[in-house]
Amino acid sequence: MLRVRYAHERGKSHPAIHWLRGYHSFSFADYYSPQHIHFSHLRVINEDIIAPQHGFDMHPHQDMEILTYILSGTIEHQDSMGNHTQLHAGEFQIMSAGSGVHHAEINPSSEHDVHLYQIWILPKSKGIAPRYEQGCFADTEGATLILSPEAKDGAFYIHQDMSLWRWQLSLEQSAVKTIPLLPTRRYWLQLVKGQLRVNDVLLNTSDGLAITHENVLQIELIQNSEFLLFDLV
């Protein structure tokens, strides 16, 4: 079964936060939709555009796996574990809040927005030691493993029974792609950019797709596309 989460139907950040254009696939902050609380262990998928010299001041998190993916621009990260660094376009960051962590995320640019996805994943156990990783992955055609409970093939470790793959497909090399699935697992596809059909369902940039009880995804590209595919219990 396929259920589309259209980009234009997502929740939006509060208009009083003038420096933020945020779009929420699931209930978050002032946005509440009883039909969109979570999907499996996915609790938050936020697409944020943050204005120059603004961002989120130091604030707490606990018992959450937090993934950030920078699409354009730069974000400056600082946390209570002693990390103080910048993430640039194409970089990923994973942080286990665990027993408790404070962090801040600020756009240091005086000119350019930062465009990012932030994704919260419920961990399989509470109270773990906080941790932090960041890095880039190969910008190649096809699938790249980003998160894995075994941290295999260079992926970041995730404290949950799930994996995350980034798919980058071009019309020149992969106009049609078949991705086998396990019907006992649940999957979420988030289209970062492009346009494609998934089992004859049309998706545009920023659309999401909840996938259950399916054996295969038949991907037909309409434009060069990038998507995140979450493999969930």
Curated annotation (Swiss-Prot):
Signal peptide (residue range): none
InterPro entries: Pirin, Pirin_N_dom, Quercetinase_C, RmlC-like_jellyroll, RmlC_Cupin_sf
EC number in record: 1.13.11.24
Cofactor(s) needed for function: a divalent metal cation
Residues that, per the record, bind a divalent metal cation: 59, 61, 103, 105
Pfam families documented for this protein: Pirin, Pirin_C_2
Claim: NAD is one of the keywords in the record: no
Pathway(s) where this gene product acts: Flavonoid metabolism; quercetin degradation
Catalytic reactions of this protein: quercetin + O2 = 2-(3,4-dihydroxybenzoyloxy)-4,6-dihydroxybenzoate + CO
Cofactor note: Binds 1 divalent metal cation.
Record's keyword terms, sorted: Dioxygenase, Metal-binding, Oxidoreductase
GO molecular function: metal ion binding; quercetin 2,3-dioxygenase activity
Domain of life: Bacteria
Similarity annotation: Belongs to the pirin family.
Record's function text: Putative quercetin 2,3-dioxygenase.
Protein name: Putative quercetin 2,3-dioxygenase PM1685
Species: Pasteurella multocida (strain Pm70)
Lineage of the species this protein comes from: Bacteria, Pseudomonadati, Pseudomonadota, Gammaproteobacteria, Pasteurellales
